[in-house]
């Protein structure tokens, strides 16, 4: 946020353009500078910022006034400044695998738990990228999804859409059968000699030192390269002569294996959390974001959750803000409640609440590890959400939720119960858990 405040006074230095990096810098013990900077790669100009000074008790209201005066986004979901809104205080029910036929059941459980919003899991989308409606869950496509959301609204519930904000799934038409040229590339090479469509060794002119050495799983960069209109998956690198990619699967991800001439570009496709990224500096960003915003507008979504917005293509402070700003610009309702998995200096103005993380396994120990994050959110004047706590297995108990909810009360943080309609019917402690959530929500 780039601010300092104590019990009496407050000051912030806030950039007013996406290319302005606001950050605090420790000069010496007990002394810090609030800085605003621009950099050539993102544009030295415009280089505008504002200085906000106020009594501590009036700081938030003064920032809200500054946003309007400076032309910054200043969402007011429900008619209130986002971070001060009642919507930022209310807990929400996160439902995955929602089908149109499940809506009445979800309404009953949402009311029982005292939730004000139902966040619909990202499987409403058949494939991230094109974001067509998942007809396995909503048989009539968008019309079915609209009916489901309308029923939630009619029941007095707000509707949220969860999705992976920067994602293009590996099976999406932007990837297969012909990979789009506007996917993020993080390393490049060139063929050292021509290859046919069957070669399992891809020779390179130089050592592929910048390519991922291994797949890396969920957190890895992956081992996919694009050569022309073909995607190739390799299993190892050869960093000594002959340089190249070993153990290659040709025509990966449904692309067509083909011959390529010497000198052809070999481009490493950057993978993040198991999916590819669209280039935020290309018009593919407008296409993918437009696909989501059209659905959000059509169902009159009250909330969007930008998941996966921390592992992007470059400097987080810039690309996180660019990503979330493009979504905000694409929405008809500029007062949509926005939440995400991360924020930066510029996107701080957009985000109305921050979640801690996904609670699973030893949820008590996990939450204890995450509690310092909630303090950090408070220091950035960001309302806290302890995050998503799963109810998918019988090992998740009401006792565990009682512990989590005590922390919600102490830290004045919302919670999201993360489950699906099948678990509503079979989990032995589902009713007790939802009753506890409702009780603590009233207390808080």
Where are the language model's segments positioned?
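Carbohydrate-recognition beta-sandwich/jelly-roll modules
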Residues: 1-118, 151, 155-159, 302-303, ...
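Autoprocessing Asn-cyclization modules and mimics
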Residues: 165, 169-257
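Mobile, glycine- and charge-enriched loop segments
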Residues: 67-99, 158, 219-226, 242, ...
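Glycine-rich, aromatic-flanked loop segments that form ligand/cofactor-binding clefts
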Residues: 58-77, 111-119, 144-187, 335-368, ...
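Generic beta-strand/beta-sheet core signal
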Residues: 120-121, 160-162, 228, 235-237, ...
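Aromatic-lined carbohydrate-binding/catalytic grooves of carbohydrate-active enzymes
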Residues: 86-189, 270-315, 321
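Flexible loop/turn segments at secondary-structure boundaries
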Residues: 125-131, 166-171, 232-234, 311-315, ...
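Active-site-proximal substrate-binding groove within the catalytic cores of carbohydrate-active enzymes
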Residues: 319-444
């Amino acid at each position: 946020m780039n601010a300092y405040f104590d019990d009496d006074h407050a000051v912030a230095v806030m950039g007013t353009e996406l290319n302005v990096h606001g950050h605090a810098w420790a000069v010496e013990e007990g002394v810090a500078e609030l800085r605003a900077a621009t950099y050539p790669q993102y544009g030295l100009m415009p280089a505008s910022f504002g200085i906000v000074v106020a009594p501590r008790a009036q700081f938030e209201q003064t920032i809200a006034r500054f946003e309007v005066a400076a032309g910054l986004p200043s969402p007011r979901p429900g008619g209130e400044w986002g971070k001060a809104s009642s919507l930022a205080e209310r807990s929400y029910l996160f439902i995955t695998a929602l089908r149109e036929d499940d809506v009445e059941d979800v309404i009953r459980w949402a009311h029982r738990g005292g939730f004000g919003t139902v966040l619909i899991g990202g499987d409403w989308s058949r494939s991230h990228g094109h974001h067509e409606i998942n007809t396995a869950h909503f048989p009539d496509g968008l019309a079915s999804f609209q009916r489901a959301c309308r029923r939630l609204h009619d029941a007095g519930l707000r509707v949220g859409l969860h999705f992976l904000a920067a994602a293009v799934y590996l099976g999406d038409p932007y990837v297969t059968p012909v990979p789009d040229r506007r996917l993020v590339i993080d390393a490049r090479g060139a063929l050292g000699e021509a290859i046919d469509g069957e070669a399992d060794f891809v020779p390179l002119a130089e050592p592929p030192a910048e390519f991922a050495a291994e797949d890396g799983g969920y957190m890895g960069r992956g081992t996919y390269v694009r050569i022309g209109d073909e995607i190739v998956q390799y299993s190892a690198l050869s960093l000594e002569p002959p340089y190249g990619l070993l153990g290659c699967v040709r025509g990966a991800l449904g692309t067509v294996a083909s011959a390529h001439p010497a000198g052809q570009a070999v481009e490493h496709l950057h993978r993040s959390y198991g999916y590819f990224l669209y280039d935020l500096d290309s018009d593919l960003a407008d296409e993918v974001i437009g696909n989501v915003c059209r659905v959000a507008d059509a169902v009159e979504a009250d909330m969007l959750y930008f998941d996966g917005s921390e592992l992007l293509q470059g400097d987080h402070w810039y690309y996180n803000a660019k990503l979330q700003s493009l979504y905000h610009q694409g929405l008809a309702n500029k007062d949509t409640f926005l939440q995400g998995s991360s924020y930066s200096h510029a996107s701080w103005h957009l985000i109305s609440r921050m979640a801690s993380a996904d609670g699973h396994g030893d949820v008590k120990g996990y939450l204890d590890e995450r509690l310092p994050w909630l303090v950090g959110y408070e220091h950035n004047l960001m309302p806290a959400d302890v995050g998503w706590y799963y109810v998918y297995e019988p090992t998740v108990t009401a006792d565990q939720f009682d512990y989590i909810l005590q922390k919600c009360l102490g830290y004045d943080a919302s919670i999201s119960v993360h489950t699906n309609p099948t678990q509503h019917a079979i989990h032995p402690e589902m009713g007790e858990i939802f009753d506890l959530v409702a009780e603590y929500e009233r207390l808080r």
